[in-house]
Each structure stands twice: as structure tokens, then as C-alpha cells.
């Protein structure tokens, strides 16, 4: 495929995912509201800026939103119907979300803990979920250990955390650090050694910065 055709293909896939996300949102709503309210809520969801502008740019936001909604939809489905197929699909989507957004691992742990204490799913099926999730993420974890001698899932956890926890962050986050307000941070990033640990050290700078922001102003950032 030529570059332009490839871009159009990516845009088309993002549009499809964004459109299907609205339908997933509608299905999730039906667990709590009437059909009428579910349709109204889904329409409002369909016109929020995130669903519109991410389709016109090369971004992982569309697939992350799609997987997040699919995760919730499959969670409700699994609680109601504990079939092997639902267990496998839920586990695979959970693993993919952890690979897309490392911080989702925290959400997964809390979800897993809630399911465990509420006894929504028996222990055997919970163990199956953990095994499948581990199998999904293990190739990338092993790859990172071979290259960096560290057991890490993704190399952008710190940056993603900082995007949502800096003084310019809004609801959708703020990720531009090449500005005057973040001069010290920018200088630290520029001085990172370009060795095989570059990506890890680069991300750790943002992780430490985000952690400092949260510790100094926990009410604002936490």
C-alpha cells in the first residue's frame, strides 16, 4: 500500500472503532437505564469531541476507548453468563488494554478484587482469567526483559501519568513538554543518554515528575 492509502485505511479503521464504541456504550447503558435513556446517553456520547477529532488523526485514543468500553461490556456479560467463551474474550481484551495503557493494570486489579470479594465469579474462573491475561502480555514483557533487563509492560506509563498530572492538564490531559512552563523537564529529557535504556530512562523522568506533582498537591492531582 502507498503511504496515503495506508493513512486512509488507518482513518477508516478508527472511524469504524469509534462508531462501534457508541454501540458498546449503548449496550452498557442498558444495564442501568431504559432503552430511551440509553439512546439519549449514546447520542450525547457520540458527539463528544474525543469521538470526533481522534478519527481524523493518527492516535491510539480510538482503540483505547473501544477496548475500554468492550472491557466493561464483557465484564457485565461475564457476570451474567460465565461461559468459557466470555472468560476468554474478557481476558484477551483485558490483556490488550494493559498493553495499550500500562496504568490500566491498576484498574484491572481493582476490578479483579471487586469480583473476588463479591463472589461474582468463582475462584477457578478467576484463575483462568489471570492465566489468559498473563499469556497475552507475556511476549511483550519477555521482550522488554531481554532488551532492558527489567520486567516492564509498557514504556510510556510515566509519560501517560504525567499528561494527566501536570499544571496544564485538563480533562483530556496535556502532553506538550517543549514549552517554557516545562523548561526544567525538557532539559532533563534532552540530557538522557541515547543508549539501550533510553526509552526507560526517558519515561522514568515523567514518572518521577508526575509522582512529585501528586505528592505536593494530592487533592488536585490524585
Where are these regions (language model features)?
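Transmembrane-embedded, aromatic-rich helix segments that form part
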Residues: 65, 89-90, 103-118, 155
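Loop-to-helix entry region of an early transmembrane alpha helix in multi-pass inner-membrane enzymes
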Residues: 2-20, 39-42, 54-57
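Short helix- or helix-capping micro-motifs
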Residues: 15, 38-49, 53, 64-66, ...
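Transmembrane-helix motifs of polytopic, lipid-linked glycan transferases
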Residues: 12-32, 70, 74
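Membrane-interface transmembrane helices that cradle and orient dolichyl/undecaprenyl
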Residues: 32-35, 71-89, 116-120
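Membrane-proximal stem/loop segments at transmembrane-domain junctions that anchor or position
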Residues: 148-222
Amino acid at each position: 500500500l502507498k503511504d496515503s492509502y495506508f493513512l486512509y485505511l488507518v482513518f477508516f479503521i478508527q472511524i469504524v472503532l469509534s462508531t462501534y464504541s457508541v454501540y458498546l456504550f449503548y449496550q452498557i447503558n442498558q444495564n442501568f437505564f431504559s432503552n430511551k435513556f440509553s439512546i439519549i446517553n449514546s447520542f450525547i456520547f457520540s458527539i463528544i469531541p474525543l469521538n470526533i477529532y481522534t478519527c481524523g488523526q493518527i492516535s491510539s485514543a480510538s482503540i483505547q476507548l473501544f477496548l475500554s468500553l468492550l472491557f466493561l461490556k464483557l465484564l457485565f456479560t461475564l457476570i451474567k453468563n460465565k461461559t468459557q467463551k466470555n472468560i476468554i474474550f474478557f481476558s484477551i481484551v483485558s490483556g490488550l488494554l494493559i498493553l495499550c495503557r500500562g496504568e490500566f493494570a491498576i484498574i484491572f486489579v481493582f476490578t479483579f478484587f471487586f469480583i473476588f470479594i463479591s463472589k461474582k465469579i468463582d475462584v477457578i474462573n478467576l484463575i483462568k482469567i489471570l492465566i489468559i491475561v498473563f499469556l497475552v502480555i507475556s511476549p511483550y514483557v519477555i521482550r522488554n526483559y531481554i532488551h532492558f533487563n527489567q520486567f516492564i509492560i509498557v514504556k510510556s506509563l510515566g509519560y501517560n501519568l504525567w499528561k494527566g498530572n501536570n499544571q496544564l492538564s485538563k480533562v483530556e490531559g496535556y502532553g506538550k513538554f517543549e514549552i517554557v512552563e516545562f523548561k526544567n523537564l525538557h532539559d532533563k529529557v534532552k540530557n538522557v543518554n541515547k543508549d539501550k535504556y533510553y526509552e526507560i530512562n526517558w519515561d522514568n523522568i515523567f514518572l518521577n515528575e508526575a509522582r512529585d506533582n501528586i505528592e505536593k498537591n494530592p487533592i488536585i492531582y490524585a
